[in-house]
């Protein structure tokens, strides 16, 4: 689960992280009212959407030379003028895709006199099985570009969960970020604060880009992105209250109601698979044969007929889908259950696109019999390679 920048910063501030004074607003009137409560004279007006690259993003409704989703203002009047342009309009960034996201709230905060911009994140390093800090002196920019062009400027420090952030860890991080004097003191205090927030709130990612050193030598969290482990949300009702459903894909919300692992993508071939590994392999082979998957969808090992029906309906609800591939290897999951679910869904919503079904494993013959006797126009496949070629050919034939 993701939250907005202002929510992330407020959460980190409760642990003691230094942030600027700021207010979240939902209207131009609120922007004017609350901006007057900030010290000024420099303000930053930030679009609040669940996507990165806001500063370099562009609003669909504005001229091409208009400013992006993060803007500086030197007066309350400029804050208001920017709010009028930003609220209600669609911001397109490298992470939103061409559709963009509508900006329904802004975060207005005090400006800062910046000396240096740094990068810091905490995530789970699965190669060592521990939380790890990833830091770089190249903050305020695309960390992926830094990793590709100058990987030596990125430093990773794994943390022993039994010890937490030790003095040695903090010193390594301060050295990697080249912090000196007051900035080093602030950093050494901040690192364990961030780690505590990360672990106590079951975060999967905590990213600060940039973490700034101001001209007075103090360190401040200037931007924050936080994602939480969805499997641990039951422990954190306070975090669940921060969820903004308007920022989430409607199909993904519906899938979560049935405990389906669904991620919307930009392609045109819908996929329903059991098992994350097989689902990824299915998407790979679709791309291999020149098409693009419309989604990742893992129905899991013990799905019921109702769950399979819901999964199929979610796929067909995507107008971009021009074909569907059902790829099931039955272990715990039984092929006849998949067949019954698919047939029930098709009878309810209709079938307007080609459907290829590949079944293998438990009750496979019964599953194939159910589909063959259903009277539906279903294309059978013998294996994954055959299934991928058939669905790609069927879609391109349309």
Curated annotation (Swiss-Prot):
SUPFAM superfamilies: Glutathione synthetase ATP-binding domain-like (SSF56059), Succinyl-CoA synthetase domains (SSF52210)
Binding site residues for Mg(2+): 209, 223
Domain ATP-grasp per the UniProt entry, residue ranges: 9-254
Gene that encodes the chain: sucC
Catalytic activity: succinate + ATP + CoA = succinyl-CoA + ADP + phosphate; GTP + succinate + CoA = succinyl-CoA + GDP + phosphate
GO molecular function terms noted in the UniProt entry: ATP binding; magnesium ion binding; succinate-CoA ligase (ADP-forming) activity; succinate-CoA ligase (GDP-forming) activity
Function: Succinyl-CoA synthetase functions in the citric acid cycle (TCA), coupling the hydrolysis of succinyl-CoA to the synthesis of either ATP or GTP and thus represents the only step of substrate-level phosphorylation in the TCA. The beta subunit provides nucleotide specificity of the enzyme and binds the substrate succinate, while the binding sites for coenzyme A and phosphate are found in the alpha subunit.
Record's protein name: Succinate--CoA ligase [ADP-forming] subunit beta
Binding site for substrate: 274, 331-333
Enzyme class: ligase
GO biological process entries: succinyl-CoA metabolic process; tricarboxylic acid cycle
């Amino acid at each position: 689960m993701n939250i907005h920048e202002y929510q992330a910063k407020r959460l980190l501030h409760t642990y003691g992280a230094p942030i600027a004074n700021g207010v979240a607003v939902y209207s131009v009137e609120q922007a004017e009212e609350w901006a007057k409560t900030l010290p000024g004279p420099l303000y930053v007006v930030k679009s609040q959407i669940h996507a990165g690259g806001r500063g370099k993003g562009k609003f669909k409704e504005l001229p091409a030379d208009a400013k992006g989703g993060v803007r500086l203002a030197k007066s309350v009047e400029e804050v208001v003028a920017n709010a009028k342009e930003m609220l209600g309009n669609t911001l397109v960034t490298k992470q939103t895709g061409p559709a963009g996201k509508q900006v329904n709230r802004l975060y207005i905060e005090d400006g800062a006199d910046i000396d240096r911009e740094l990068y810091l994140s905490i995530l789970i390093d699965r190669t060592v099985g521990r939380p790890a800090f990833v830091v770089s002196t190249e903050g305020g920019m695309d960390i992926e570009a830094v990793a590709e062009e100058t990987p030596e400027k990125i430093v990773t420090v794994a943390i022993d969960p039994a010890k937490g952030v030790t003095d040695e860890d903090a010193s390594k991080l301060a050295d990697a970020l080249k912090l000196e004097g007051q900035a080093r003191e602030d950093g050494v205090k901040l690192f364990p604060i961030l780690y505590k927030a990360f672990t106590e709130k079951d975060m999967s990612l905590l990213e600060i880009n940039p973490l700034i050193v101001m001209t007075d030598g103090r360190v401040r969290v200037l931007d924050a992105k936080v994602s939480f482990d969805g499997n641990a949300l039951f422990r954190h009702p306070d975090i669940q209250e921060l969820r903004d459903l308007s920022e989430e894909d409607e199909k993904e919300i519906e899938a979560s109601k049935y405990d389906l692992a669904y991620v919307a993508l930009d392609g045109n071939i819908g996929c329903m698979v059991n098992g994350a590994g097989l689902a990824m392999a299915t998407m790979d082979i679709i791309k291999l044969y020149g098409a693009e998957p419309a989604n990742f969808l893992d129905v899991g090992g013990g799905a019921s007929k109702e769950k399979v029906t819901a999964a199929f309906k979610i796929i067909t609800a995507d107008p971009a889908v021009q074909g569907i591939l059902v790829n099931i290897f039955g272990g715990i999951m039984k092929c006849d259950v998949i067949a019954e679910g698919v047939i029930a869904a098709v009878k309810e919503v209709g079938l307007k696109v080609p459907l290829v079904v590949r079944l293998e494993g438990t009750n496979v013959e019964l599953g194939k019999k159910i589909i063959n006797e259903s009277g539906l126009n279903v294309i059978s496949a013998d294996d994954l390679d055959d299934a991928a070629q058939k669905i790609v050919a069927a879609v391109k034939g349309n």
